[in-house]
Amino acid sequence: MSILTLAGSPSQRSRSSALLRHAAQLLRARGLGISELGLRDVPAEDLVEGHYAGPAAHALRARVAAADAVLISTPVYKASFSGGLKAVLDLLDDKALAGKVVLPIATGGSPAHLLALEYGLKPVLSALGARHILAGVYATDKQVRVDDDGVSHIDDDVRTRLEDSVERLAEQLRPRGVVVNEAFDLGRLALAGGFSV
């Protein structure tokens, strides 16, 4: 399984990027492969001018196409997700997220900015073909801090919600045959134990 993380902030010390890195660590601990992509990986000129046919845009689309799941993080500015993230999403094909599990992650100044996920980001993800968008993780600036050394401090409540979301994402990526086999094995075990099934 291939998972792509897409950071919608140009700052390495961004709170939303800190949450994204923590989610990636949790997924790596489960043995899942992670590929990271940020705004700095696409030339600013390509983003500003929308160079859809350029080599960076082709590479971006190839990385998204290869992913089974995409985690997208963004800071919320002026009640919407970041313009840099929108510029990246504009370089994708119309159905670039079709068949992929998508987990949105955002941070903002107040709880009121949570609506930016539902009414700002999710409609754009849907327009890109995403049909399996997990409930997003939102945190306020007070709940996620990045110190001068770049070390992230995430409140327990946010950490728990992020871990739950990562668990749901991992469940969605688990091969369906594994679930069927486990159910089959439980049925055989019940029969062997003399239980009627």
Predicted regions and their residues:
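N-terminal beta-loop-helix "entrance" segment that forms/cooperates
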Residues: 36-56, 145-151
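Helix-loop-strand module that forms the ligand-binding subsite of alpha/beta enzymes
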Residues: 52, 56-129
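Glycine-rich phosphate/pyrophosphate-binding loop and the adjoining helix
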Residues: 134-197
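Cofactor-binding loop segments of dinucleotide-utilizing enzymes, especially the Rossmann-like FAD-
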Residues: 8-10, 39, 107-108
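N-terminal beta1-alpha1 ligand-phosphate binding loop
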Residues: 1-32
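Residue-level recognition of beta-strand->loop/alpha-helix junctions
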Residues: 7, 38, 136-138
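Active-site-adjacent alpha-helix of alpha/beta-hydrolase-fold enzymes
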Residues: 22-29, 123-131
